[in-house]
Structure formats: structure tokens, C-alpha cells
């Protein structure tokens, strides 16, 4: 049985790239390529898989209706899957106790956990606000794979 540390190790091996899957209202699966990383949940302190998602996407619509996600990372023949419930915070998904400044810092934390770097953080913050980006955190219920 794999652990979240295995996911974290593999995700670093491919620039944070992984496949995130949600359920559409008709029960079919919607998958997309995302950048993700492992970080501490800002409220619970548990280790979670985090990603930044553009506002208005099908992924966010699906997650609001059914807040569960599967994330798979693969490097070569090694892979790890994380399944779990999600927590969303963003301009269109406010959370009590997470103000605009906290969201700005959290967006940066998720981006860097996914291996991201930026030469102009003010520009990064501007784009995140303009795109109404949200933070999606997956709390692992099941972790499995061969990695």
C-alpha cells in the first residue's frame, strides 16, 4: 500500500504533473492534466494534495456538486493514486476565516508545493485574481499504487 509520501516523491519527478478526475452530473468521469503538490491543509494541518484551478471550469462545477476527486501521478512505470474528499476556497468559494490575503498566500503555497517558481509574485497574484483561481485540496481517503 502506498502512502502520501510516495505520491509526493513521484510528483516531484515530473514537474508536479498529474491527472485529476472528477464526476460529471451524469456519473461519467472528467479528467484533466494539472499541476499538484503536497502541503499542509491551512485549517486542519493534515497533509493534502493541492492544486490551483481556474475559476469557472468544469472541474470546479463538478467538485461543487460532488466534492470527491481522484489524482494520479505517474513517472515511468511507477504510479500512485490519491482518492479523497475536496475542500475548495477561492473568490467564488469563500470559506470563513480565509480572507483575501490568506487566499493570496495559499495560492502561492500550492503553486510552490507543485514545484512552481515565479520571477514576479505581484504579477502571479494579479493573474490569480483576474482568473478567479481557487485552491482545491484533496484529503486522502485512499492512497494506492506501485510507487
Predicted regions and their residues:
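Short, basic/aromatic recognition patches
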Residues: 1-19
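Charged, gly/pro-rich active-site loop segments
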Residues: 78-147
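Short beta-strand segments
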Residues: 15-55, 61-63, 69-73, 81-85
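Hydrophobic alpha-helical segments typical of transmembrane helices
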Residues: 3-7, 59, 106
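Structured helix-beta-strand junction loops
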Residues: 13-14, 65-66, 130-132
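A generic structural signal for nonpolar/aromatic side chains embedded in well-ordered alpha-helices
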Residues: 10-11, 63, 110, 138
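Charged, amphipathic alpha-helical segments
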Residues: 2-6, 53, 119
Amino acid at each position: 500500500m502506498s502512502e502520501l509520501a510516495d505520491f509526493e516523491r513521484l510528483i516531484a519527478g515530473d514537474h508536479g504533473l498529474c491527472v485529476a478526475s472528477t464526476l460529471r452530473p451524469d456519473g461519467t468521469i472528467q479528467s484533466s492534466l494539472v499541476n499538484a503538490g503536497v502541503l499542509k491543509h491551512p485549517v486542519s494541518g493534515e497533509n493534502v494534495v493541492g492544486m490551483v484551478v481556474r475559476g469557472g471550469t468544469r472541474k470546479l462545477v463538478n467538485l461543487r456538486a460532488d466534492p470527491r476527486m481522484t489524482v494520479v501521478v505517474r513517472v515511468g512505470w511507477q504510479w500512485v493514486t490519491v482518492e479523497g474528499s475536496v475542500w475548495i476556497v477561492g473568490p467564488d468559494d469563500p470559506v470563513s476565516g480565509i480572507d483575501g490575503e490568506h487566499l493570496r498566500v495559499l495560492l502561492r503555497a500550492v503553486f510552490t508545493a507543485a514545484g512552481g517558481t515565479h520571477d514576479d509574485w505581484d504579477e502571479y497574484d494579479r493573474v490569480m485574481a483576474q482568473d478567479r483561481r481557487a485552491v482545491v485540496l484533496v484529503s486522502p481517503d485512499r492512497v494506492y499504487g506501485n510507487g
